[in-house]
Amino acid sequence: LDMGRGTLYYYFKDQDELFRTCVETYIIEPKQKVLNSVTEDITVEGMIQTMTQYLNHLKEALMTFDNKSINTGNVNSIMFTAYGRFPALHRKAQRLALKEVDLWRKAIYNSQRAGLIKHGIDVDQIALMFAHIKNSYDSGLGRTQMNFQLLEKTYYALYNLLKKK
């Protein structure tokens, strides 16, 4: 938030308000911004690029913290804690999650129409698989920093399985 400790105490009445603001600023708002930028003609490859953009923003935000072992498990724990404390934030995150799955579904259909990927696949299941790649605990095992390259690599691995040969 680019504030000193004294400034934080001035602007935020308690730790809960500060926590909620940090979650919104570093996790919710960037995701909302990239999802809102998606156009109707998005393809799977375009959606991968969009989600990579979000992950790059998240990576930059996490690099500003002193703790270099922040990983997927930590981020998910933070989100679950925030959801328990702030129901409105939880509803906002749920809407974003549903929107993301819908955008993946749209991207898959658009890619099928463009002849880029196979027909006859379970679009709903594949959309969920794409949406959950970034939540993978594998990218944060061993108390090491989140491996953002692994996430992008996984997106493309799934996409390559769907491509027409």
Please report, for each region that a protein language model flagged, where it lies by residue:
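Hydrophobic alpha-helical connector segments
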Residues: T21, L35-I70, V123-F130, E152
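C-terminal peripheral helix-coil segments that are non-catalytic and often amphipathic
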Residues: Q53-A61, D102-A114, M129-S139, R143-K165
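Helix-turn-helix
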Residues: L1-T25
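Amphipathic alpha-helical packing segments from all-alpha helical-bundle domains
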Residues: N71, S77, F86-A114, Q125-L128
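Hydrophobic/aromatic residues within well-ordered alpha-helical segments
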Residues: Q15, C22, Y26-P30, M51-Y54, ...
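Residues in soluble alpha-helical coiled-coils and helical-bundle/repeat scaffolds
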Residues: K13-E17, T21, V38-I42, G84, ...
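Well-ordered alpha-helical segments within folded domains of soluble proteins
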Residues: V75-M79, K134
